[in-house]
Amino acid sequence: VELGLLDAGICGYDWVYENGNVGKVQEICELNYSKATTNPVRWVLAVPNDSKIKTVKDLQGKRISTEAIGIVKNYLKKNHVKADVEFSWGATEVKAPELVDAIVDLTETGSSLRANNLRIVDTMLTSTTRFIANKKSWKNAAKRAKLEQLKMLLTGALEAQRRVLLKCNAPAKTLDQVVKVM
């Protein structure tokens, strides 16, 4: 999207951040949904339950596995910690403690971390799904109008999931009684 190959897309804020595109794409709206809930997802630093690691400072010189190298390196830099960060091709939560000292993984509910006897030390980034556009496309009035329509449809569909539509065939004279029952 940022390169202009696509006018718009839907992705997690975490991937906009991971790829260095914050401010380089136009955020049209936030779409509050994820795999299991409508809550944001979190990139968390996790260690085995029996690990002596209690804070980010304890990661000095340690090995960390993650699918989000950029997020982790930025986090470590902000906290003045030097550690080895290696890319994980999936199943990150099973790598600690045998292969690495800590992991950084995406969690929505924490159930996978708990199932693998891991505890969360810190949350590095909270992310939600975003509808984004190429900045040049956003400035084009015709494209922007279509993107605004898509925004309305997407947000409307998500909002509709939280509502119930009830239709009822009843004589007009019983309207007050029907409303009381509902």
Task: Please name every model-derived segment.
Residues 2-182:
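Domain-level signature for soluble enzymes in the chorismate/prephenate branch of the shikimate pathway
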